[in-house]
Amino acid sequence: MKTFRYVSGLPEKIKLEKFEVDGKRTYILPSGKHVPSITTVLGHFKKASIAQWRNRVGAEEANRVSSKAAGRGTRYHNMVERYLENQPLEKVITESTMPDLREMFKIAQPTIDRIDNIHYVECPLFSEVLGIAGRCDLIAELDGKLSIIDHKTSTKEKKEDW
């Protein structure tokens, strides 16, 4: 198993206060400016297609699929975090780990193993200029290049033009 290294001596992560306004996540930047989350901004572009999908499959099925996807994402993120914390593989993938998550992790593991020199985990990011904020899963080196990394668990490949 790979041992991940963490970079020491970095500044403390900035803490951004977040709250909901009309069901939309908003952050308060260090300057005091209130900005929407990047997820909220991007969500405006998806609303029509999500509404069409919900109408096509029905509310009950849409809620079931959405709930399953959210749960899978949370469990997968927890697995990856344990792995990046250098926990033994048997603590990352346990007997209770669902088969789909086992498979997802096994597929992703070679890519995850290309990560090193971890700077931050679950890190807030923001732009005063763009007026947005959010969180990334990881700031670390991927193949030796400092990168912003966000773990994705979609079961469908996204089109390049999305």
Give the location of each predicted region.
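Metal-dependent nuclease catalytic cores that hydrolyze phosphodiester bonds in DNA/RNA
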Residues: 1-133
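Mg2+/Mn2+-dependent nuclease catalytic core
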Residues: 119-162
